[in-house]
A protein has these predicted regions:
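Residue-level detector of intrinsically disordered terminal segments
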Residues: 1, 23-26, 222
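Bacterial N-terminal signal peptides that target proteins for export
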Residues: 1-11
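Feature activates predominantly on carbohydrate-active enzymes
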Residues: 102-312, 316-337
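Acidic, contiguous N-terminal accessory segments
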Residues: 23-169
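Generic recognition of cysteine residues
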Residues: 6-7, 41, 96, 298, ...
Length: 337
């Protein structure tokens, strides 16, 4: 099991190639930088083009709303900054367009860097759908930031085409065992989008904690979202003790997402071409639900109790359990589009 610290260290390590200043003195061709590797890419090390730090981007009038929204996301990510729309194509540093008929998921794109007079670079990015143009820019983030100089970017000219091999490119974040704040989830989404991952699988419930507000069952989060911190700081499921009452003063580790916070995460991820997929564990791995609502148990054991006590499967034969499942799913459908 990877804990939160390891998870973020891995994300930081993966993102190094996309951070300003991460480039080497030698100019790196696109095929040596891009991760994942594009479908096809060709560079010319002998022809280096130069781009300013703050790129002026041209788009046809019909595409301006799409491109402007995309540049706002890129500026917010902070790896490239100062991206702006220009109406003057001749002076643009990058030319973007959405054209053609989308095939498959519409995530494919083409990109090339040309070298003009006095070594001036011009980026050309083309896709048949907005999501393809988004991924074209994520590739440019990687290539440009790996070739940053003091005054801008110096990059070997290239031409590339990219179409995803897999439609579902996902990562699972277990927020039940180790809670991640909204800000931390957003940071993870940014790292995912940089590397063209498009599904965030949120493991919202398990024995160690329930992490999403369900308005009809408030004890799920007022009790089962909190547990007593482990003394040595190491993960040990057998030692997990959930709050035995609301506002238990000993149960200080944990947290949960309100439904509005989850909608905020979903919208943030959607703007970065990431779909959030919720997971609610049933009928097993349900100790957190049973802990808060004892009528989900077959043998009538009084809950809450401390620790796992060997039981983590709800009783699917009871009308109360079926009603609980339906109610939870109904609220999930209202939150997740």
């Amino acid at each position: 099991m990877m804990n939160k610290g390891c998870c973020f260290r891995l994300a930081a390590w993966l993102a190094l190639s996309g951070l300003p200043g991460a480039g080497m003195a030698e100019m790196l061709p696109a095929e040596e930088v891009l991760l994942p590797a594009p479908s096809a890419c060709r560079s010319d090390r002998a022809a280096v083009a130069h781009l300013p730090l703050r790129l002026a981007v041209y788009a046809p009038e019909k595409d301006v709303p799409v491109v402007e929204a995309l540049l706002n996301v890129l500026n917010a990510q902070g790896v490239l900054s100062g991206l702006s729309i220009t109406r003057d194509k001749a002076s643009a540093d990058a030319v973007c367009s959405v054209e053609g008929t989308p095939s498959g998921t519409g995530e494919g794109y083409e990109a090339r860097l040309e070298r003009g007079g006095e070594g001036r670079g011009i980026l050309h990015l083309k896709a048949a759908a907005p999501q393809g143009l988004f991924y074209a820019w994520q590739s440019m983030v990687q290539v440009l930031s790996a070739n940053r100089t003091g005054e801008g970017f110096s990059v070997p000219v290239f031409s590339l085409r990219d179409v995803p091999r897999f439609e579902w490119r996902g990562m699972m974040l277990d927020v039940s065992r180790h809670f991640f704040t909204v800000a931390e989830v957003k940071r993870m989404v940014d790292a995912m989008s940089l590397f063209k991952l498009n599904r965030l699988h949120l493991h919202l419930t398990d024995g160690p904690g329930w992490r999403l507000e369900i308005k009809k069952y408030p004890l799920l989060t007022s009790m089962s979202a909190w547990r007593v911190p482990l003394a040595d700081g190491e993960w040990n499921w057998r030692e997990v003790k959930l709050a035995i009452r609301e506002h238990d003063p000993e149960a200080t580790y944990g947290g949960f997402y309100t439904q509005e916070q989850m909608r905020e995460i979903i919208a943030y991820a959607r703007s970065r071409q990431v779909t959030v997929v919720p997971e609610i564990d049933l009928p097993g791995h349900s100790y957190a639900a049973m802990h808060a609502y004892g009528d989900l148990i077959c043998d009538g054991v009084d809950f809450p109790v401390e620790g796992k006590k060997g039981r983590d499967a709800v009783c699917m034969g009871r009308p109360e359990t079926l009603r609980f499942v339906k109610d939870v799913v109904d609220e999930l459908k209202d939150v997740f589009p």
